[in-house]
Amino acid sequence: MLTHKTCQARKKMQVSFVIRDAEEKQHRNGVNALQLDANNGKLYSAGRDAIIRVWNTRTDSSEKYIQSMEHHNDWVNDIVLCCNGRNLISASCDTTVKVWNAQKGFCMSTLRTHRDYVQALAYAKDREQVASAGLDKAIFLWDVNTLTALTASNNTVTTSSLTGSKDSIYSLAMNPSGTVIVSGSTENILRIWDPRTCMRRMKLRGHTENVRCLVVSPDGNQVVSGSSDGTIKVWNLGQQRCVQTIHVHKEGVWSLLMSENFQYIISGSRDRNIIVTEMRNPSNKTLVCEEQAPVLSLGYNIDKTGVWATTWNSDIRCWKLPMYDRCTLNSSGGMDAQWTQGGTEVACIKGGAAIKECAVLNDKRYIITKDSQDQVVVYDVLRVVKKEQLGAVDFEAEVKKRNKQVYIPNWFTVDLKTGMPTIVLGQEEVDCFSAWVSIEAGLPECVDPTTEIKINYGKLLLEALLEYWTPPHSIPPNEMEPDMHGNGYFQVPKHTPVIFSEVGGRTVCRLLVRDAAGDSESTLLHETAPQWVTDVVIEKNIPKFLKIPFFLQPHPQMTKPERTKKDRLVANEFIQCRKVCEHVLEKVLNAETTPSGGNANNSLQNSQSDANSEGSQLPAEERIELWCNDVVVDPNMDLRTVRHFIWKQSTDLTFQYKTKQNFNYDGK
């Protein structure tokens, strides 16, 4: 038994998990941000698959992977390296900011101050100060030394906030000395603060669409901005105005990188182009490369002869930068300036495929997916594993081929946002306890021929996901009773991430299946797991059965004029139609049939005697025939499948019954 903490004000919760390999060495979706530690050549990449990965850029080997940093469960939008590369700060769509030990790759602490997606970070190196901003219109300032000193007992942190933003913030920048901080938003303006006093200094107008990227000059006097309106603007903060508008892209500018002397702009755009432009002379520009997809982020390589670029795709490429040569002698004896050739791909960190399409099969146990490389895969949702790699086959044809004529209620939803299948269980629009099936249909490998068992998919899966959870303060089991963990049928991979989150809101808890046995994880689960989870996992309560009302009446071919009675019955929706046949044979015909020359008391004996003469050992479905909508019903179908595929009406399901030829019934 467990006394579970309840909170009336707690928001509705959902549980989700990811079907994936134990170690995902490749990004499975676009990469939003890059940070390079030039001291050791480590490149940190923030993925839309919720994973931060670390790469060795000093090796020429194709195997550059070092490690993964996992604790987010949604897109990682931005990262910054701090403390000379010892720590890393990350911002995510899961509404959190996380502090990491960059060398060992583990999450040190999680900041939950934001109320919506955290889109951008800014870093003042000289002050070890980080700012975070996002769709909640809020900007928070953090002291990095304080963040890295947080422990389980010393977990209180104070933050300053910058107020005044009126719309979602998508970009943020600070100069190294931390004297200027600039934000860009869907308000289409730049707002400037002094982070030392948190005072607003000014706002700058000029862009006509969202401001997606920003860079502040080291002295804090200039700002360069890129916008979805396709322009790059240079702003003089002393003059409080735009001093240069640069048109080099056909679509939105999403990433900016400046040369050390703040004279050249490297820009990446939705038009897939990466371009170098001289800031004071915008006509002096050259194309670095055309990427395969819209460019999301840019970062220098170690010696700054090349630029790393990320896109909507999962590959990370390094391109050689062209150099601006002012020492070319022209035909008239003067000096020309020209760009040396660039645009050569000098390195590539290959990414994996992102799942783009998904179909849930009618049995509601398997899903079929198609990824960005047209590979089709079958996943077993119940066992949380990849079941079959089908290759580049016809996705729609495969779904059609594998779909059976069976109806199981939806008990989960699938989210493909990270590029990997995330399965969501809840109690809102889709009830995770709605799928009751016979064990023969759901787990044929576990069938006991001596028993007739019904299983609930959602219950079994939650028990497997939380198999290792032993709640604190739980009463020890009776010595005569086994201490039951798991579901008794199967286990799921121990590396599976399990996430508890508010419905449509922030993440509350994330852990791996195997980690639920830990003291801190167990306590956290006790505090956050919703009652509907503990009811089945801890209390071992059985989810309620869903019932279907239906009518049962004689078929016109066997009914005499005086026999038109229509019975209304209610049964569990997973009951197979053979059970209805048994009811007709044992209850309806026996109770209401009076064979000629006999009386009601011996009607069952007479009907059974007739049946015996024709082979009474046959099961009920061999003697009784059910009809629905003028279609003979397969006795193996359950009630919900008949209602879905044959009845197809909102009114109560109606069956008609009649006897088969091998059953001699006098009422025919």
From Swiss-Prot:
GO biological process: one example: positive regulation of canonical Wnt signaling pathway
Effect of a null allele: Viable but sterile with reduced lifespan.
Region (Disordered): 592-616
GO cellular component: nucleus; peptidase complex
CDD domains reported in the protein's UniProt record: Ubl_WDR48, WD40
Classification via InterPro entries: G-protein_beta_WD-40_rep (IPR020472), WD40/YVTN_repeat-like_dom_sf (IPR015943), WD40_repeat_CS (IPR019775), WD40_repeat_dom_sf (IPR036322), WD40_rpt (IPR001680), WDR48 (IPR051246), WDR48/Bun107 (IPR021772)
Pfam families to which the protein is assigned, alphabetical: DUF3337, WD40
WD-type repeats, residues: 26-65, 71-110, 113-152, 164-203, 206-245, 248-287, 290-329, 350-389
PANTHER family recorded: WD REPEAT-CONTAINING PROTEIN 48
Job description of the protein: Regulatory component of the Usp12-46 deubiquitylase complex. activates deubiquitination by increasing the catalytic turnover without increasing the affinity of deubiquitinating enzymes for the substrate. The complex deubiquitylates the wg/wingless-signaling receptor arr/arrow, which stabilizes the receptor and increases its concentration at the cell surface; this enhances the sensitivity of cells to wg/wingless-signal stimulation.
Assembly and binders: Catalytic component of the Usp12-46 deubiquitylase complex consisting of Usp12-46, Wdr20 and Uaf1; regulatory subunit that, together wtih Wdr20, stabilizes Usp12-46. The Usp12-46 deubiquitylase complex associates with arr/arrow; the interaction leads to deubiquitination and stabilization of arr/arrow.
Family statement drawn from the similarity comment of this UniProt entry: Belongs to the WD repeat WDR48 family.
Name used for this protein in its record: WD repeat-containing protein 48 homolog
Annotated organism of origin: Drosophila melanogaster
Encoding gene per record: Uaf1
